[in-house]
Swiss-Prot record:
It comes from Salmonella typhimurium. Belongs to the outer membrane factor (OMF) (TC 1.B.17) family. GO terms for cellular component: cell outer membrane. This is Probable outer membrane lipoprotein SilC. Pfam families: OEP.
Amino acid sequence: MFKLKLLSISTIFILAGCVSLAPEYQRPPAPVPQQFSLSKNSLTPAVNSYQDTGWRNFFVDPQVSRLIGEALNNNRDLRMAALKVEEARAQFNVTDADRYPQLNASSGITYNGGLKGDKPTTQEYDAGLELSYELDFFGKLKNMSEADRQNYFASEEARRAVHILLVSNVSQSYFSQQLAYEQLRIARETLKNYEQSYAFVEQQLVTGSTNVLALEQARGQIESTRAEIAKREGDLAQANNALQLVLGTYRAVPSEKGIKGGEIAPVKLPPNLSSQILLQRPDIMEAEYQLKAADANIGAARAAFFPSITLTSGLSSSSTELSSLFTSGSGMWNFIPKIEIPIFNAGRNKANLKLAEIRQQQSVVNYEQKIQSAFKDVSDTLALRDSLSQQLESQQRYLDSLQITLQRARGLYASGAVSYIEVLDAERSLFATQQTILDLTYSRQVNEINLFTALGGGWVE
């Protein structure tokens, strides 16, 4: 008889939680093409398929790796993301605890006496244990726990996304700072050249080989360049501030090195890059976990329409003497099965289910939006790869031509064949082209970083 009762109780506990009313999860189809359109010139071939080589291998410049490591230790955004993971884990533990039996102990003392003092004061001691357990036949508690578990996984992916964004921001801030250094250096070199030209024109004015107009034009070029230097100094100060902010520390930032020193290993891509690679991005994985949590919430909302069964049992003992509280004959036991059947709640359960279904639909849309946005990120960076390389090659050839043009213009001006305005035009074009090449070099570095992170790189070290 005892074995039969034990078997019945065990069966109840096994059945509790076996049923789930949550919809069966099916990953929504990706609303993007199966493959990216790749230009042959934009590829650095990979052996088989794309693999994240790790950010330490991607950034060849050791200075960048050092700064990224420092930021990972000090950045407040990353620290906050880690705390949110701990928060989600704690929330899951709180919710999951409701699925298991709850055992509580209690003790107390009661004093009784007459209001007029005509009766002696008596005291009674009591102590007891109470065990309660909700039979989760329809999976309400299980689905609530599952929803928080999926939200915990989503918070982990959110932390990965912050990590990757931080790697990207640190590297881009560093290259932006190096760009500002290089732009300032070229502006200062240009100023020296203009000052030499001014001295030459001034000498020619003394000998009568030129006029005051040419001298004033040379002076104007000097003042214009000084203004440009002041602007570049301001840009450098702002770049240093931005780098310190993303690093999370206000120690000294790297000094001038030159933008060409910040080498990046090209992202290696296979000939046929599948869009399925986007599924490894943390923002998309976060959206998928949120979708799974929304499915579980539907299951919990559906279970609210069904009866809730709670079993409570306890042992208690009471006595007027503390010494005899646990003696034979002073104890009692109780067993209280309780069933709650929802009959009328003004449509609350229906509204909760409708709310859960709408949020699940929102999660599907959010998941699809994340994939489309990720597809655009990768497609944009791939499209820019060729464009930036071609622009750089053309600008470099143009720079070579301008250097020859400037030399000839100076020679012709010295012989009196052309006016000084020809020299000024050549110098201005040369300076502007040098700045353009720097901007394009920086843009190509940033684009390669964006491609690296758009494919989910930046998490593996």
